Amino acid sequence: DLWQFGKMILKVAGKLPFPYYGAYGCYCGWGGRGKPKDPTDRCCFVHDCC
């Protein structure tokens, strides 16, 4: 779920997930479309697919 995904981002990246990644790239945040712009955005894309 989104809560667990946020906890994982905090642990791995050491940053609060929503201020830093809430509107990042094409897939981090609400919705998503297009091609992921980098590995971080790809991780959000994969999360959206599950």
From Swiss-Prot:
GO terms for biological process: arachidonate secretion; defense response to bacterium; lipid catabolic process; negative regulation of T cell proliferation; phospholipid metabolic process. It catalyses: a 1,2-diacyl-sn-glycero-3-phosphocholine + H2O = a 1-acyl-sn-glycero-3-phosphocholine + a fatty acid + H(+). GO terms for cellular component: extracellular region. Transmembrane segments: none annotated. Its cofactor is Ca(2+). Binds 1 Ca(2+) ion. It holds the Pfam family Phospholip_A2_1. Disulfide bonds join C28-C44. The keyword NAD does not apply. InterPro entries: PLipase_A2, PLipase_A2_dom, PLipase_A2_dom_sf, PLipase_A2_His_AS. Signal peptide: none annotated. Contains 7 disulfide bonds. The active site is at H47. It comes from the Eukaryota. Snake venom phospholipase A2 (PLA2). In vitro, shows anticoagulant activity and induces cytotoxicity when tested on C2C12 myoblasts/myotubes. In vivo, when tested on mice, induces myotoxicity (intramuscular injection), edema (injection in the subplantar region) and lethality. Also induces neurotoxic effect on mouse neuromuscular preparations and has bactericidal activity on the Gram-negative bacteria E.coli (ATCC29648) and the Gram-positive S.aureus (ATCC 25923). The catalytic and anticoagulant activities of BnpTX-I are higher than those of BnpTX-II. Belongs to the phospholipase A2 family. Group II subfamily. D49 sub-subfamily. PANTHER family: PHOSPHOLIPASE A2 FAMILY MEMBER (PTHR11716), PHOSPHOLIPASE A2, MEMBRANE ASSOCIATED (PTHR11716:SF9). This is Basic phospholipase A2 BnpTX-1.
